[in-house]
């Protein structure tokens, strides 16, 4: 029987954490994953994290393990959209003449969710289009 009602969701929370917080420049450790799970009232041990990451790999998530000395980390290497593609989408939305400012902000927030939190910061750009006001996100 699960220790908490969320225990069965552990692997989904691990996937969410990896997608949101890791990229090639920002690997996450098993300790960080365990702390994240604990914040959601889910208990986990290192060995179960390793097996859950293997299961996510089997599912098709491209998770890379990196090692620096005694520190081991993981990051999601391949995503549906690469950062330059997301920048292109953001620029296209910002420069569109028929999308309202409110809808532009909403769409950009959704596009940012397709990247890690670190890469999403790089999507905050300014685009100036003739006959449109400056849009800064």
List the predicted regions and their residue ranges.
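Bulky hydrophobic/aromatic content
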Residues: 80-134
């Amino acid at each position: 029987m699960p220790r908490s009602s969320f225990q069965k969701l552990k692997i989904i929370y691990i996937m969410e954490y990896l997608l949101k917080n890791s990229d090639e420049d920002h690997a996450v450790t098993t300790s960080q994953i365990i702390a994240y799970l604990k914040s959601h009232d889910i208990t986990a041990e290192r060995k179960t994290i390793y097996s859950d990451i293997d299961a996510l790999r089997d599912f098709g998530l491209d998770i890379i393990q990196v090692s620096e000395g005694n520190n081991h980390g993981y990051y999601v290497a391949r995503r549906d959209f690469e950062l330059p593609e997301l920048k292109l989408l953001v620029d296209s939305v910002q420069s569109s003449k028929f999308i309202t400012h409110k809808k532009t902000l909403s769409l950009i927030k959704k596009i940012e969710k397709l990247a890690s939190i670190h890469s999403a910061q790089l999507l905050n750009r300014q685009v100036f289009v003739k006959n449109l006001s400056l849009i800064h996100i």
